[in-house]
UniProtKB/Swiss-Prot annotation:
The PRC barrel domain binds ribosomal protein uS19. GO terms for molecular function: ribosome binding. Keywords: Chaperone, Cytoplasm, Ribosome biogenesis, rRNA processing. The gene is rimM. The lineage of its organism: Bacteria, Pseudomonadati, Pseudomonadota, Betaproteobacteria, Burkholderiales. It comes from Janthinobacterium sp. (strain Marseille) (Minibacterium massiliensis). Residues 96-179 form the PRC barrel domain. This is Ribosome maturation factor RimM. It holds the Pfam family PRC_RimM. GO terms for cellular component: cytoplasm; ribosome. NCBIfam families: 16S_RimM (TIGR02273). PANTHER family: RIBOSOME MATURATION FACTOR RIMM.
């Protein structure tokens, strides 16, 4: 099978589950729907390949799954440490005001005054809500190669995030340059 261009890293195999070839997957997201619904997973161990996911369920915060061709506990243990990737196109559909974090990374961020703040470099969760990590472009006049890149941390909540336009690749926020 041809490797899809839209693969997203969603977790890793942390070990075997039981004796019958099931694997335990530690998802990188609290929402493991993509792992539960995608029929094909891409693993990087022993070499990069696709595998059919036959059955899966949530178990104590992890996902446990039965994969085609993984016949017993030893075969499942041999996959320990393998990363799991799924095509973005296989993720479950979301409602209009819901977003997968992977879709926000790379979007430009500007404030209500039209000032460009930077680009979303990552997302993180502080327990209360998600946070946009926005990489601020370094000023051209900065000549110090050791200067640390600037970063804004903007809560991804309705109070600060006004619009997310995935088509225009832009997020508009109520956030000042001096916050």
């Amino acid at each position: 099978m041809k490797v899809p261009e839209d693969l997203v890293l969603v977790g890793y195999i942390s070990g075997a589950y039981g004796l019958n070839g099931w694997v335990r997957v530690r998802p990188y997201s609290a929402d493991a729907d993509a792992l539960l619904t995608a029929k094909t997973w891409w693993l990087d161990k022993p070499e990069f390949h696709d595998v059919e996911m036959m059955q899966s369920k949530i178990h104590t915060g992890d996902v446990v799954a039965k994969l085609m061709g993984v016949a017993g506990r030893d075969a499942a243990e041999a996959l320990k440490g393998a990363t799991v990737q799924i095509p973005r196109s296989h993720f479950p559909a979301l409602s209009d005001n819901e977003f997968y974090w992977v879709d926000l990374i790379g979007l430009e961020v500007e404030n209500l005054q039209g000032e460009h703040l930077g680009q979303v470099s990552d997302m993180m969760d502080n327990g209360a809500h998600p946070i946009l990590r926005v990489a601020v472009p370094q000023a051209a006049e900065t000549t110090d190669p050791k200067a640390a890149p600037q970063e804004l941390l903007i809560p991804f909540v309705e109070q600060f995030v006004i619009t997310v336009d995935r088509t225009a690749k832009k997020i508009t926020v109520d956030w000042g340059l001096d916050y």
